[in-house]
Amino acid sequence: MCIRDRAINSTANVLRPSLQIIKTAPGVKTVSAFFLMMVPNCEYGENGVFVFGDCGLCQNPTSEELCVIAKSSADSFKGFTGKEPRVAFLSHSTKGSASHPDVDKVLKALELTKEQYPELIVDGEFQLDAAIVPEVAKTKAPDSEVAGTANVLIYPDLDAGNIGYKLVQRFAKADAYGPITQGLAKPVNDLSRGCTAKD
């Protein structure tokens, strides 16, 4: 197991040698990162436990890359919790409520994920509340098996993911473990320079 600490180093300085030395896992084309989020006193997700992907590495992933991120994040959730992942692709739109190329990217990622990984419980596109709040899901996405129950949240880009995890960490006082790199042949952990001793 390889753990790289960037409490004083940039992500690039940590991941460049990781990619050069460790390489990607067999069959994986996209290396990404996730956060294991543990939100206190929260009934959403898996009793407050979520995986957020990608919040630390892929700046503006394509639909194809989002598909791989979804699969890797689902596997990471299962590996850490032992629970069944329920994957939601996040967007500013829920089930066609808005039209935009950014929404199209997420819809294409969902289509690819369902084709390539039919065993995954996955759906989208969802606004956050539709993904995790059952009462909202009943109104916005009543026919979805994921809406209102998602425990793996796939962000459309790094801006949304990074802002999202930090909002939950700071406002909800959640424990945020990561970014943990996924898709490499060996585990790599890349700590934020804003990390605490507890992290």
Language-model features, listed with the residues they occupy:
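Conserved small/polar residues in nucleotide/adenosyl-binding loops
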Residues: 1-3
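Anion-binding alpha/beta catalytic cores of soluble intermediary-metabolism enzymes, centered on
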Residues: 5-147, 151-199
